[in-house]
A protein has these predicted regions:
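Solvent-exposed alpha-helices and their adjacent loops that cap or buttress functional pockets
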Residues: 12-15, 74, 138, 159-160, ...
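Glycine-rich phosphate-binding active-site loops on the catalytic face of alpha/beta enzymes
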Residues: 102-112, 146-154, 184-207
Length: 213
């Protein structure tokens, strides 16, 4: 298992060894119901024991999110913990405050990227248009998420960008890893297909067990 990244360069190491990120979208009941919250934490603990640490939490603009993610950071210091659906400066500030190692944008926002860079916080842009991809590269982005990837797989030919690490996202499951790895993506983001109704897809555990054998 790789230790949680201590700098941006370490993120590249994680991409080379771990082919997916699990996106958790907390429901209001996770914030307010300790039983549900404990169940999710048990699932995360099982993932860590299986050698998986790439968890990102969808950002919400409320105090409950801050408390929840801060608690995860304290309970699971080994997690490579990130925030997702980043859309404004407050979401960056909240991510830094809670100890997130990185964040991912849903779309492209040049000003937000510059703001995150000024805070020395790793923000991975979401790209769906070629013009946005070119802007991201001009700003020296070395890790870029293509979202939604199924709509853009033919529009964005990632093979021509040799020095960029691409992450695929949008409606993907653990079974999609071989396809997107073959297309040149370093990793994929698994959202609702991997975490739904506060439960992690059993196929993810199966995949992790096969990898460890």
């Amino acid at each position: 298992m790789i230790s949680p990244l201590k700098n941006k360069d370490s993120f590249h190491e994680i991409l080379n060894s771990e082919p997916f990120f699990l996106l958790v979208k907390p429901t209001q009941s996770i914030y307010t119901n300790s039983i549900e919250s404990d169940l999710v934490e048990q699932e995360i603990e099982l993932l860590i024991k299986a050698g998986f640490i790439n968890i990102e939490i969808s950002w919400s603009n409320n105090e409950n999110w801050l408390n929840y993610v801060s608690n995860l950071r304290l309970k699971f210091p080994k997690l490579n913990l990130g925030s997702a659906s980043i859309r404004n400066k407050k979401s960056i500030d909240d991510s830094i405050k809670t100890g997130c190692n990185y964040s991912m944008m849903r779309g492209w926002d040049r000003d937000l990227l510059n703001y995150s860079n000024s805070k020395n916080h790793l923000l991975i842009p979401g790209i769906k248009h070629l013009k946005d991809l070119k802007q991201a590269i001009e700003l020296n982005c070395k890790i870029i998420k293509v979202y939604p990837v199924k709509d853009n797989i033919e529009l964005i030919n990632i093979s021509q960008y040799k020095n960029i690490n691409f992450i695929a996202a949008g409606g993907l499951s653990i079974s999609d890893i071989p396809l997107y790895k073959s297309l040149g993506y370093k990793a994929i983001v698994i959202g609702d297909m991997g975490f739904k109704n506060n439960k992690i897809d059993p196929k993810i555990y199966e995949w992790l067990r096969r990898r460890s054998n």
